[in-house]
C-alpha cells in the first residue's frame, strides 16, 4: 500500500529497530500519528535526551548517565569478580536476579570470525587492563550460548588463564542459541551458581 511520504518515512524509521518488521512498524507509525502533540513531543524529547545523556562507563563499558557507572563505584560490591557480558541488556538481566554482587564488563559484541569481527573489534583490551592490578581473581564469562559466544569465551579463557585468573562460564541452564536477556531469573541464578571452569 502506498502511504503519504511522512508516514512512509516514519514506518521506515520504526522498521530499522531490531525485531520490528514492516507490519509492526506500520502499526507503531499510525499509533504515533494518533497520539496528542504533547505525547509525541514528550516521546521525542525522551528519545533525544536518552541519546544525548547516556554514555558508556569508562571502566566497564555499561550504558550509564554517570561515568564511572553506579555499579563500578559501589564499594559494597565484590571487587574480586568480574562478569563479562555481550551488551548492557545482559547487565540489566543479571541485576534483576539480585544475587550477583560482583562487577561487570561489557564487550559490545562477540568475536565472530564468520562476520569478520576479531578480538580487537570488541571491548577486550580494557578488560585486560582492569585485571592488571591483581585485585580480580575470577572472571565469569556470560556470553550467549551461540557459536560466537563460545568463540569469545574460549578466547577470553586462553588469554587470561596464563595470568593465573580463574575463568568460569555460566552453567548450561541456558538453551543453546538463547539470549541471556530473555532468560528468567531462576535460570540465570542457577547458571551463576553452577558455573564451570574453562
From Swiss-Prot:
CDD domains: TOPRIM_recR. A zinc finger (C4-type) spans 57-72. Gene3D superfamilies: 3.30.60.80, 3.40.1360.10, 6.10.250.240, RecR Domain 1. Keywords: DNA damage, DNA recombination, DNA repair, Metal-binding, Zinc, Zinc-finger. One of its GO terms (molecular function) is zinc ion binding. GO terms for biological process: DNA recombination; DNA repair. It holds the Pfam family Toprim_4. InterPro entries: DNA_Rcmb_RecR, Rcmb_RecR, Rcmb_RecR_Znf, TOPRIM_dom, TOPRIM_RecR. Residues 80-175 form the Toprim domain. The keyword rRNA-binding does not apply. Belongs to the RecR family. May play a role in DNA repair. It seems to be involved in an RecBC-independent recombinational process of DNA repair. It may act with RecF and RecO. This is Recombination protein RecR. It comes from Streptococcus agalactiae serotype V (strain ATCC BAA-611 / 2603 V/R).
Amino acid at each position: 500500500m502506498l502511504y503519504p511520504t511522512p508516514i512512509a518515512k516514519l514506518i521506515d524509521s520504526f522498521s530499522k529497530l531490531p525485531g520490528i518488521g514492516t507490519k509492526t512498524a506500520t502499526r507503531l507509525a499510525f499509533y504515533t500519528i494518533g497520539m496528542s502533540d504533547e505525547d509525541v513531543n514528550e516521546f521525542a524529547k525522551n528519545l533525544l535526551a536518552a541519546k544525548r545523556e547516556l554514555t558508556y562507563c569508562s571502566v566497564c563499558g555499561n550504558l550509564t548517565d554517570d561515568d564511572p557507572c553506579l555499579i563500578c563505584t559501589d564499594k559494597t560490591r565484590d571487587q574480586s569478580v568480574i562478569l563479562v557480558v555481550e551488551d548492557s541488556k545482559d547487565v540489566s538481566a543479571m541485576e534483576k536476579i539480585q544475587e550477583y554482587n560482583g562487577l561487570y564488563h561489557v564487550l559490545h559484541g562477540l568475536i565472530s570470525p564468520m562476520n569478520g569481527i576479531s578480538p580487537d573489534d570488541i571491548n577486550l583490551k580494557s578488560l585486560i587492563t582492569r585485571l592488571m592490578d591483581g585485585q580480580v581473581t575470577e572472571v565469569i564469562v556470560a556470553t550467549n550460548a551461540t557459536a560466537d559466544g563460545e568463540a569469545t569465551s574460549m578466547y577470553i579463557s586462553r588469554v587470561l588463564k596464563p595470568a593465573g585468573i580463574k575463568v568460569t562460564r555460566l552453567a548450561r541452564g541456558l538453551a543453546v542459541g538463547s539470549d541471556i536477556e530473555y532468560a528468567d531469573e531462576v535460570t540465570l541464578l542457577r547458571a551463576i551458581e553452577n558455573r564451570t571452569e574453562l
